[in-house]
Design a protein with these regions (language model features):
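Conserved SAM-binding loop
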Residues: 42-155, 233
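S-adenosyl-L-methionine-dependent methyltransferase catalytic module, highlighting the catalytic core
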Residues: 3-10, 19-39, 64, 82, ...
Length: 242
């Protein structure tokens, strides 16, 4: 399905020089992280169902995870996001097979439409009630596997990129996801995540040092997500993924 958006919508959000540099750093990190053990995308890659033939990327954003996954998995993928400029970036990069401009709180898909439903860094942008509803909805849409990644601990973030949906509303705890039947792995170190992000209060040159600490903490927080700054949550609905 080809996505057609009004021409009046700007492809590139307005960013300050600092934000543009932070985005460039973030993209460099996006290349390195999936290839680094104990990071979120590396964990997703190790546990994703290899026999899946279809994937829904919920809140796909700029599509950075699919830059890595699409080159390794042979499946049809659909990306949905509410923010048109991000979706345009994905479309230009051909990161998914098709795109839907829509709200993750009202997903327009039928029950059991996809083998795998991937939802990376979305839960924290919703209220507690909306997040709980999203979890239940994605479990209805998936045939085989549901995958979430979301921050742990303090991770303050306000809107940026002219995108009001970027603000964090509610942070989930590993125990809450385990109670819902998810296997949970941690990454990084609690309360460090926001120090390396686009809205970090630290000078740009210091943020890579935070990333080094984040990676070094990986072997410990991976099996102890309550100590982590981010978590990967996976529920296999069919047989165990390989």
């Amino acid at each position: 399905m080809s996505l057609r958006l009004p021409q009046a919508i700007s492809i590139q959000p307005r960013r300050s020089v600092g934000e543009r540099l932070a985005v460039a750093i973030d993209r460099a990190q996006s290349f390195l992280r999936p290839r680094t053990p104990f990071t979120a995308l590396n964990t997703v890659w190790r546990h994703i169902d290899r026999e899946a033939s279809s994937l829904l990327d919920v809140g796909c954003g700029r599509g950075e995870p699919m830059r890595f996954l699409a080159g390794k998995l042979r499946l049809s993928s659909t990306g949905i996001d509410i923010f048109a400029p991000y979706l345009r970036e994905c479309q230009r990069g051909r990161l998914h097979g098709q795109y839907v401009l829509g709200d993750v709180r009202r997903l327009p898909f039928r029950r059991k439409s996809f083998d795998v439903v991937l939802c990376m860094e979305v839960l924290e942008h919703l209220s507690e009630e909306e997040g709980a509803q999203l979890i239940e909805t994605l479990e209805r849409l998936a045939r085989r596997q549901v995958i979430f990644t979301t921050p742990v601990g303090d991770w303050d973030q306000h809107e940026f990129d002219d995108n009001v949906y970027q603000a964090h509303q509610r942070i989930w705890a590993p125990a809450e996801m385990k109670e819902r039947g998810y296997r949970v792995w941690g990454q990084g170190l609690r309360n460090l995540g926001g120090l390396s992000g686009i809205q970090s209060p630290l000078p740009l040159l210091l943020r890579p040092l935070v990333d080094v600490l984040w990676v070094l903490a990986g072997p410990i927080s991976h099996s102890r997500p309550e100590l982590a700054g981010n978590m990967v949550c996976i529920k296999n609905l069919g047989r165990e993924a390989t």
